[in-house]
Structures are given as C-alpha cells and as structure tokens.
Amino acid sequence: MLYDFVFNGWGMKFAANHDNLITRNLCHMKTFSDEVVPANMQPFVLEGGSIESDGKGTLMTTVECLASVNRNEYLQQEELERYLKDIFGLDRILWITSGYLAGDDTDSREDTIAYVRCEDEEDEHYEELKAMEEEIKEFTRANGEPYRLIPLPMADKVEWEGERLPATYANFLIMNGAVLVPFYDSPKDEIAKAALREAFSDREIIGINCLPLIKQHGSLHCVTMQYPEGFIE
C-alpha cells in the first residue's frame, strides 16, 4: 500500500503544489511495482520527517508539527491519534510537546531513542531541548521498560546570511548497511559519529559534509525518501 498524503511546505511556509504531484505522477509513469496499491490519503497533512516508528506498534511524533493549525487544523489531537492508529495499525502514540528544533529521531531498534542534548545554557535551544529530554525519559516501551537513550551533541551554531541554520546531528539517514551522519566541520562531528556507532554497531557510520545542504534548511534525512524493498519496478 502506498499512501499519498498532503505535503504543504512545512506548514504553508513555502509553495508545495508541484511536490504534491510527485507520488501520483510516479504512479502514472508506472514507477512502482504492479503489486503496489496507491491510496489517496488527502487532505491529511503528513510530512515524512514528522513521525518515527519502531515497527512494533509504537509511533513517536510532536504536537507542534502534526497538530499545528497550519497542517491539520480541523482535527483535535485525539482525532489525529485515532486516525494514525487506524491507517498504520498502531497500538500507541508517544507525543513530544517540547523541543522546537527538529532534534529527535528514533533508530531502527525498537528499544532505543537517539536525541539531541544541549549542554550550553546560553544556547537559545537549551530550555526546550532540556524539557524534551526530561519528557522522553518518562517514555516507556510497550512492555513497560524504559527506552535506551543515546544523546547526540548539539551542533555548533551554523549561520548564513545572518541567520542561524537548523544544523542537527539527529538528521542522520539509515540505509542498507550504513548510517549517514551530517558533518558540519566541527569537533563535535566525531562525537556524534561515535554516539551513532554505539546505536548502530552492525552498520558503517559515514560522515557527510552537510554545510552546503543546510543552507536549504534541511539535511540528509530531509532530502531523501525511502521505499521498502520491492516497491520500485
């Protein structure tokens, strides 16, 4: 099943009309296997980077993104939860209410959460990310056991044309046999790489210079789309 949701330019910040045509155009071009059944899930707004699942019935998301008035204003949080559980076959949803930088990401193991920890009290993200850290410490797995938490360093400030860019090591990309981690020409790059090596001991950890990419306000995870094996013809 191939779900086609609405992408509205990260909460109507940018025009996204052409983006929303990609999935149906690929279907018309017969890009996908004949066994793939497309399903029109519009007008529900859901961007890929806003949800994370352990593949075991638990999904993690943020209130600020998914329940934003610029995305799904016609649905209350309880309605969002029922909808997500229904279409994805979920047992439960963990809602994060803190952390305005996209600095959290679950990895492929269902017992681990990798997240950004900010230790600089003068950093503008400190309070929000500290609150997020305390929040996820209270999360438990479906069996009641706590998650294994792996902190990633807060990336050094990256500025361009007078603006601070959303550099984060949590924007890593999991792929077959490897994990690509954003590098920002900082001593913290190797710290982040070592942390992810702890989380993914069975994969190669590869650093990618993302200073050019971050100028577009995103990184590795933001600019990629993963399809399950067998989807592409």
Model regions: which residues?
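The feature marks the mature, well-folded catalytic cores of soluble enzymes
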Residues: M1-E233
